Amino acid sequence: MGQKINPTGFRLAVTKDWASKWFAKSTDFSTVLKQDIDVRNYLRQKLANASVGRVVIERPAKSARITIHSARPGVVIGKKGEDIEVLKRDLQVLMGVPVHVNIEEIRRPELDAQIIADGIAQQLEKRVQFRRAMKRAMQNAMRSGAKGIKIMTSGRLNGADIARSEWYREGRVPLHTLRANVDYATSEAHTTYGVLGLKVWVYTEGNIKSSKPEHESKQRKAGRRNAAAN
């Protein structure tokens, strides 16, 4: 029976980039990694209503740069930049180095897998029917230009005694094609019946072209033809 790999890890260095960009010695690696996890957990709680999609952490020499991708940058910044200053102070305490925070706006939040997953989780916590929440998110994504979307939820759905999983898919979501631009995210909904898990796959904009120059691939093909002819 085939098992599904994490689509983001599967496509690293092909179509996806790392969310943490730094190098550490083996003696410091676990400490730095734990800091990254703490920072992401803090931002997830602090910015729960800011529609945060991706958080990129970079570590230049003895400092840190955090880029927050949000559909609602005004909520992150706050009035006259007050909230972002508080955020920066808290992050400096967590990381122990000077922190620079950048905010980037997500233009189409309906196509961001993390925002979709968090949005469904918030609806489930407000006792919205899980099928209705899932199908509404799928319709919004397809209307916004997605080629395909798949949403899966697991747990005690609608308060059932036995936990189960249900998933819905619209369009196509290629899992084996490395060049396919598949965005993947997970989230959790904490309900009175327990924790529900959510997984979202969003396929957009078709296949991504290879990063290799076109003339290079043509030269290789010509070389293979000459070798075969000889």
UniProtKB/Swiss-Prot annotation:
Keywords: Ribonucleoprotein, Ribosomal protein, RNA-binding, rRNA-binding. HAMAP family: Ribosomal_uS3_B (MF_01309_B). Part of the 30S ribosomal subunit. Forms a tight complex with proteins S10 and S14. This is Small ribosomal subunit protein uS3. One of its GO terms (molecular function) is mRNA binding. Residues 39-107 form the KH type-2 domain. The lineage of its organism: Bacteria, Pseudomonadati, Pseudomonadota, Betaproteobacteria, Neisseriales. InterPro entries: KH_dom, KH_dom-like_a/b, KH_dom_type_2, KH_sf_prok-type, Ribosomal_S3_C_sf, Ribosomal_uS3_bac-typ, Ribosomal_uS3_C, Ribosomal_uS3_CS. NCBIfam families: rpsC_bact.
